């Protein structure tokens, strides 16, 4: 029964006591009645409690050193980048907590989004994922190359926000404190430093579209994704507290840095210093270099924190294979241990795996596929061979010259 007005019996709300004549509607349950005003009040209380839970979570953000310790458990190398990210992420969530807990407007803390520059397989995506996981905030990944500006065939930038909302189980309040990682940002650089009259579909126009949501706006997001249509119901989300981390390889930017520093050497030789390799040049990147590469000044201005990641060497890749909590070698050892089999990788085998990843220019990202190639036959055959107690992976096995060594009880 809903809104039923009987002349014989006057119904009263079980919560506030108001009669059916004093409210717009009363909803009946099993010997319980609730009016429309109490329903509205309940919804408001629930909304406030959810917001308080989010704010409470923000007050417990790990300190920069604690964040660095978490990153060190999973990410090998990239020490400068990890420190920069730890400070930036801590300051971001401290800013949200500070802003929402103060009533005065004496200080306006600006959002500091992050730009990560580094070669393929250096750990950009994994760093962002690990940070989001350690903070227990919603996380979404987008590929900049799939985005187009409004009016062209492709994916609207608002669809990035939909991915974050979905990661938050459609809890918009949680999504508004999440992290979005946009990969391949260097692929939407302008094709030249000079502004062109004609705009490329996936270049400067996409930067302009991303700029709006990165700097903070109330965006309208189609619940099912895709293009917006008239009369379509939208999800409203405020992006002012969403942390945006964008990353890319920026192949060739070290040459821009060399050119800039070279000009300084010619003009001001006594104040210059020699830089020996490309890795060191990456640590010298400034906004001017990124602009010359093709990102527009307004976009760069919204990414004040720049973290440069270095190319991983053989030693780094071996440590990645063996040291982190989720190290690939540990994972495969655990899998075979369920069959009662011990797994050992010889040092030369680890060096061969790392060497292949470097040859393929895939970095850490390519390690799993190389191990999969090496381990496929073992993972297929050994579970059925009860007499096998140990498997030893050699350099020759990695290179395909022989099979892994099996030890039998």
From Swiss-Prot:
Keywords: ATP-binding, Chaperone, Metal-binding, Nucleotide-binding, Zinc
Chain sites annotated for binding Zn(2+): 13, 16, 35, 38
BP terms from Gene Ontology: cell division; proteolysis involved in protein catabolic process
Positions with a binding annotation for ATP: 119-126
Signal peptide span: none
Intrachain S-S bonds: none
Keyword Chaperone recorded: yes
One Pfam family here: zf-C4_ClpX
A GO MF term: zinc ion binding
Chaperone among keywords: yes
CDD domains assigned to the protein according to its UniProt record, in alphabetical order: RecA-like_ClpX (cd19497)
InterPro entries: AAA+_ATPase, ATP-dep_Clp_protease_ClpX, ATPase_AAA_core, Clp_ATPase_C, Clp_protease_ATP-bd_su_ClpX, ClpX_bact, P-loop_NTPase, Znf_CppX_C4
Domain ClpX-type ZB residues, every copy: 1-54
GO cellular component: HslUV protease complex
Assembly and binders: Component of the ClpX-ClpP complex. Forms a hexameric ring that, in the presence of ATP, binds to fourteen ClpP subunits assembled into a disk-like structure with a central cavity, resembling the structure of eukaryotic proteasomes.
Family note: Belongs to the ClpX chaperone family.
Biological role: ATP-dependent specificity component of the Clp protease. It directs the protease to specific substrates. Can perform chaperone functions in the absence of ClpP.
PANTHER family noted in UniProt: ATP-DEPENDENT CLP PROTEASE ATP-BINDING SUBUNIT CLPX-LIKE, MITOCHONDRIAL (PTHR48102:SF7), ATP-DEPENDENT CLP PROTEASE ATP-BINDING SUBUNIT CLPX-LIKE, MITOCHONDRIAL-RELATED (PTHR48102)
NCBIfam families reported in the protein's UniProt record: clpX, PRK05342.1
Protein name from the UniProt record: ATP-dependent Clp protease ATP-binding subunit ClpX
Taxonomic source organism: Streptococcus equi subsp. zooepidemicus (strain MGCS10565)
Record lineage: Bacteria, Bacillati, Bacillota, Bacilli, Lactobacillales
